[in-house]
Each structure stands twice: as C-alpha cells, then as structure tokens.
Amino acid sequence: QPAGDGAHDDEDDHRGGRYRAIFISDIHLGTAGCQAQALLGFLKAHSSEHLYLVGDIVDGWQLRRRWYWPQSHNDVVQKLLRRARKGCKVVFIPGNHDEFARGFLGHEFGGIEVRDDAVHTTADGRRLWVTHGDYFDGVIQCAKWLAFLGDNLYEFTLKLNRYLNTLRARMGLPYWSLSAYLKHKVKSALNYVTDFEVAVAQAARAHGHDGVVCGHIHRAEMRDIQGTLYCNDGD
C-alpha cells in the first residue's frame, strides 16, 4: 500500500520503494561494529508511513564503558529525526542495551514516540505485537551479570567480524555476520533461541494478537509458530 506524500525525505531516492511499515532493531549505535552506513543507505532507499525502532538502537552498555560516536552514527539519528519531521510515524521501543530510554516511556523526542511496546495493524487487518523481546530472554531475566559478561564477548566478536569481512570483501565474498552466527550457536546449545521464539509467540497469542515482531537475539526469522506469525528483525 503506497505511503502518504509526507512519509519520505526529499533528499532520498526511494529506489527500494515505499512501505506501510518498516521494522528495524539491534543497530547498536555507539559500537565500532555498527553498520551505520548500510543503514543510512537502506533508509535513503526505502520510505514508510510507520517506522518501528524495535530496541537496541543505541548501545548504552558500550557507551558507558567507552565513548564511540562517529559522524555516521550521528547521521543515523538525524535521519530518524528528519523522517519523523516529514510525517512518518516513528515509534522507539527500547531494548536492554538502550534501557535508559525506558525512563521516558510515553514521551516524544523530536516527534519520535517512546513506548514499551506497540501494536501494528497490517493492510489485511492482522494485529502484530511489537516488542524488543529481552523480557523473554532467560539470560537477561535470570542472571543480568551473565548478560553483561556476554556483552563483552559480543563486542569482541564484532571487532573480529570487521576483520573477517574485510578479507571476505577482498575475496569478492558477501557480508557475513560472525556475531549472529556465534550467538545463534551458543544460545541454540542452551535451547534459548527456540524457547525464546516460542515464548514470544505464545505471549502474543495470549494477548489476542495475530503475530509478533521482535529483535534482541540477532537472528532474522519469519515463520508460523502454532498459528501465530513470528517475525524477528535480525540486526
């Protein structure tokens, strides 16, 4: 369904098309592994009536340890603010890495609404629950110190990931996410990924929704779980 006239930036080319809604998560602005330029390219090429920022957009954990904020990260923030000013409805749903923003639920900043969760109605009338998903992660819920330890290891894999993909680019190979691969393998061994997906889908169904859009586990997915549409943004 075409987006309204005010839902795009004049400077953007929209070669990728316009959509009713776009969902992005786990950008981790403030880390060296953030793919800010790729995100800027995506946003310039795609516009939408609704833009859902489904958590971990800013990595507050890493910024507290070491400040890292290049111009490209600032450009992403400016792009999101400009998108809101141009008429796109932008909703920010904080995750565990940007949980500091949960202290501002119900407020708007530059036209961006901060909410704990949201419900998006699709063109065919289905109700999709939008939540980051960290509330369902046993690692976060049961042992937050373990999550912080895991975050240190995750930052290391991001650095390693950059070096590996530099080599892959020289070899003409496409981008590959080592961090997502390792997180998938480690958590799969502990049955976290499967348990997470099922738990989120069950919660969505229990609340009367037809599906759920989440992030958090850095594993892009779209599948049916016992009659409920489960969608994960990946990273």
Question: What are these language model-derived features?
Answer:
Residues 1, 15-20, 29-124:
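Core catalytic region of metal-dependent phosphoesterases/phosphodiesterases
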Residues 4-13:
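Intrinsically disordered, low-complexity, charge-rich segments with an acidic bias
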Residues 21-23, 51-53, 129, 213:
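Residue-level marker for buried hydrophobic side chains located in beta-strands
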Residues 26, 55-56, 95, 132, ...:
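Active-site glycine-centered loops adjacent to acidic/histidine catalytic or metal-binding residues
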Residues 27-30, 136:
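Short histidine/acidic/glycine/proline-rich micro-motifs that form metal-
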Residues 60-84, 167-172, 178-212:
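N-terminal short leaders/motifs
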Residues 110-116, 129, 134, 138-148, ...:
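Conserved beta-sheet core of the metallophosphoesterase superfamily
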Residues 131-196:
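Active-site-proximal loop/helix segment associated with metal-binding centers of metalloenzymes
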